[in-house]
Swiss-Prot record:
Protein name: Histidinol-phosphate aminotransferase
Associated pathway: Amino-acid biosynthesis; L-histidine biosynthesis; L-histidine from 5-phospho-alpha-D-ribose 1-diphosphate: step 7/9
Its EC number(s): 2.6.1.9
Taxonomic superkingdom: Bacteria
EC primary class: transferase
Source organism of the structure: Campylobacter jejuni subsp. jejuni serotype O:23/36 (strain 81-176)
GO molecular function: histidinol-phosphate transaminase activity; pyridoxal phosphate binding
Keywords linked to the UniProt accession: Amino-acid biosynthesis, Aminotransferase, Histidine biosynthesis, Pyridoxal phosphate, Transferase
Keyword Aminoacyl-tRNA synthetase: no
Amino acid sequence: MKFNEFLNHLSNYEPGKDIEVIAKEYGVKEVIKLASNENPFGTPPKAIECLRQNANKAHLYPDDSMIELKSTLAQKYKVQNENIIIGAGSDQVIEFAIHAKLNSKNAFLQAGVTFAMYEIYAKQCGAKCYKTQSITHDLNEFKKLYEAHKDEIKLIFLCLPNNPLGECLDASEVTKFIKGVDEDCLVVIDAAYNEFASFKDSKKHLEPCELIKEFDNVLYLGTFSKLYGLGGLRIGYGIANANIISAFYKLRAPFNVSNLALKAAVAAINDDEFAKKTLENNFSQMELYKEFAKKYDIKIIDSYTNFITYFFDEKNSTDLSEKLLKKGIIIRNLKSYGLNAIRITIGTSYENEKFFTEFDKILR
């Protein structure tokens, strides 16, 4: 059977291996997953209780207006319901943005190394990709590339903080850059990890209400997969000018998010104690990862997320990843990004100590 030609130019996204697969493949009893930036404390207690109470409603289609979650988000971010769209993860909203703006006759712009799905989705539309030489977000490079190809570039991705590297721009730098972008070019701010960045440094905090008030061409993305521990329920959102949201709704299938995900998201966003515990643990434990890196002269980029990336000169990241798997520890090998590096999710104190103990043996 023949398929569309563009499929020949696409690669599959490579997620981290599952715990069950590793346990069976390597014959290990205990497996620690530090690969997918999931919340180490699991699902928020309030969301768990909500799921228990609503489990008998799994046969029902969701309220397609999603009014309860939209109202909760609108109150949190000081925007209107009409400024919000809910997706099956923020990935789906990324897909909406790409299909709304890109085609085979135009292009998009991104950092040299960033979230892989931008390029995967955009290639489905045949769009051209412009990347900075820098692997991180160098806005001077962004500006030069944009100015050189302004007629082509109709969408710009800013991943703040950046996955898989962890760096983050100051909010003032971001707004200054957007002022130089034409109104017909959509600027997507992927803020999947911004709660972590804001907790660490208030200068990194991005406020959607201020962004969409000042700019008609900005889309702010958020997710419940990281801080709020609902990755398995697949729910995220976009906040933008009402005209942008209205256009996206033409691309959205009805009932795209389950009723259980919608209910759990409302509960999770109101579980302040869980969020505080997650953030405090994350950055206290990250200091231990920095100390470990210093001990072995491993290069790092200061991370504003719930993960840290280790860069190697002589050691091979694929070899290191394989050795860790044999010890029952799953991390993310970044060879597919062209980097000799590994990304490690910040886990619980127990999980992190297990990583340090085993990785110490490997590096000796």
